[in-house]
């Protein structure tokens, strides 16, 4: 026991394999089990329908990653109960971290594309995600929807 403690202190391993602190590692979970997927932090068994990314060695690193992903892709993080009973846009929408699918500020198709781009990015296919955003930016510019084109440009710059 003492030898193990000394080795841990000396080498600072990134993961404590035995999880002696009774915690499980956090994962980024994109829940795709219903029409409007959400992004959340998840610990424990991977039973939910969706995509798990991780494990992260520290929950603070995961929370920082989630904030950056919210700024870039604007996926919702609210619980389903809150999502279904919302009558006006939330604070996350006001500070531009959510696209507002709960109150209809984004179409279902566009939100699904944002989810797909997020998953591609997290799977390491960032070139595909950026290409997809570029195509959507061009399409918005051709339709003279310059606000949407600027939003997509900002997403690309964030990545």
Give residue ranges: language-model regions:
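Acidic, glycine-enriched active-site microenvironments
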Residues: 1-159
């Amino acid at each position: 026991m003492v030898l193990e403690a000394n080795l841990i202190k000396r080498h600072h391993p990134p993961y404590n394999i035995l999880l002696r602190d009774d915690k499980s590692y956090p994962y980024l979970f994109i829940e795709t089990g219903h029409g409007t997927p959400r992004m959340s932090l998840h610990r424990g068994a991977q039973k939910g329908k969706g995509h798990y990314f991780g494990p992260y060695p520290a929950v603070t690193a995961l929370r920082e990653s989630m904030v950056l992903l919210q700024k870039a892709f604007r996926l919702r993080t609210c619980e389903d109960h809150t999502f279904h009973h919302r009558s006006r846009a939330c604070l996350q929408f006001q500070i531009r971290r959510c696209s507002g699918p709960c109150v209809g500020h984004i179409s279902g198709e566009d939100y699904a594309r944002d989810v797909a781009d997020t998953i591609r990015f997290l799977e390491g296919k960032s070139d595909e995600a950026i290409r997809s955003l570029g195509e959507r930016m061009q399409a918005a510019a051709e339709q003279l929807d310059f606000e949407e084109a600027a939003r997509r440009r900002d997403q690309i710059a964030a990545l």
